[in-house]
Amino acid sequence: DEAERLGLDAMWLAELHFAPERSVLASPLIIAATIAQRTRRMKIGTAVQVLPLCHPLRLAEEVATVDQLSGGRLIFGVGRSGFAHTYATYGVDYGESRERFAEVLTILKRAFTEEQFSHNGRYYRYDNVRLAPRPLQMPWPEIRIAAASPDTYEEVGTMGHPIFVAARTGNLSELAPLVKRYRTAWKMAGHAGDGRGAGASGRACASAAECACGCSRRGRSGSPSPTHGDSRRWPYCS
């Protein structure tokens, strides 16, 4: 309630497991559903849901449910890496994370958009699946993909998804060539505009100009505070 009263545009929720020294929640969609019932305007985003650890159909149902409960305010931020010990604890091979991410994302999109579908993949197989409920936003809640490696920047740009940039260390200007690769791939794939993205860092900047001037401040909780919008407005995209 207070966050919306103060004018926040969005609230972002992480997924962290088995790390009590730094994690305050492990189930971002459950928290998102709670926030949705106490707010009316601001966006609610996951930052990020670790797809290789999720059952894709169950996740699709939960995402659609939260999108309905929030009146279409969900931003579905997704990622791959997380921490190797989390994968081991869940019994998932960390070396499979890239392939699992791609397969889960494919299943999610099909579940959101197809009336009925079957899937025969490496990790999951389904026959004649029909998702219920369906998300309110069409074709799906905005899917924002986290990127760290140069290859991922290009892949996300080619797919035409907004990007989530983690900038916890170093100078924001070091990200300029990576974001350029994202924007180049975006254009080469024929998508309109220059791409869109969010940056998660220890800075909570009122604007790109403020960031460029070196003015930074911690978020209210002292945790990383994402900013989002058109990639042309990012301070490291000039």
Task: Label each PLM-derived region with a short phrase.
Residues D1-L8, I75, V165, L172-R183, ...:
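C-terminal amphipathic alpha-helical "assembly" element
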Residues D1-R38, M42-I44, M138-P141:
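N-terminal beta1-alpha1-beta2 module of alpha/beta enzyme domains
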Residues A14-E15, V48, A166-R168:
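Short beta->alpha connector loops at strand-helix junctions that form conserved
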Residues H17-A26, P52-L57, G170-L175, C213:
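Acidic-and-aromatic substrate-binding clefts and catalytic sites of carbohydrate-active enzymes
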Residues S23-A26, E62-V63, G222-H228:
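Aromatic- and acidic-residue-enriched segments that line the glycan-binding/catalytic groove
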Residues A33-Q37, T106-R110, G222-S225, G229:
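Generic alpha-helical structural context detector
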Residues G45-L51:
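Structural motif corresponding to the early beta-alpha repeats
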Residues P52-V165, L172-K180, T184-G195:
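Internal, glycine-rich beta/alpha segment that forms the wall or movable "lid"
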